[in-house]
Each structure stands twice: as C-alpha cells, then as structure tokens.
Amino acid sequence: MSDLDNSNLQKTLASMLKEATAIESSDLYGKVIVQSSDRWRVILCAQGLQWIIQKKESSHAGPWRAEKYLTSRSALIKACGTLGLLSDPATEVVLFALPEHVSQLAKK
C-alpha cells in the first residue's frame, strides 16, 4: 500500500471513528455518564439538553435504545432506582455528583 493510500485510509478511519462517537446509539458514543451494567447506561444527549437512560438491545451487537429522557438529577436517580440500576455503589456516586439540572453542565 502506498503512503498516499495509507494516508487516505487513516483519514477515512478517523472520520468514521469521529462519526461513531457522535451517534448516541453507538457503543463508541463519547458522552457516557455511567454504564451500570452491560445492558444499561446513562448518557448526555448530543446537544447537552438532557440525560438519557439507554438499554442495549438484546442482541449484544445491537444499538443502544433510549428508555427515559430526563433533565433533573432527582428524576434521573428516581428513574434509575425504578429500573434497578442503583445496585452498583459506583453508579450511585456518579449520579449524585451530577448537577441538579442538566442545564447547569453548560455553566461549568
């Protein structure tokens, strides 16, 4: 493979990776707040307007699907508790460390 072909391949791969990290349903999404298990995680939406509780499709190769959309920490913690996602102490610590409202993230 020539240097030019290799350079183009690297650029293409970098572009694909950047795109994958911007897609909320991707395993590579870059704004994951906490992953409480193999099948559940909390992310910050791409626009930074809300937290989303996502569940991995039953096929482990499947995408992440949104289950709940929340803007307040208290509602997020309550929803996670209802779904049984607070059994991991590390998840609890991360969620309680979030600001009371998602809009406060932009102010930090």
Go through each PLM region and give its residues.
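A short, exposed loop/beta-hairpin motif centered on an aromatic-Gly-Thr core
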Residues: G62-A79
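Short beta-strand segments and strand-loop junctions that repeat across beta-rich extracellular domains
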Residues: A46-A66
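Negatively charged, low-complexity tracts enriched in Asp/Glu with abundant Ser/Thr
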Residues: M1-W40
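Intrinsically disordered, low-complexity, charge-dense segments enriched in Lys/Arg
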Residues: L85-E92
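Short secondary-structure boundary/capping segments within folded domains
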Residues: V42-L44
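Low-complexity intrinsically disordered segments
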Residues: E92-K108
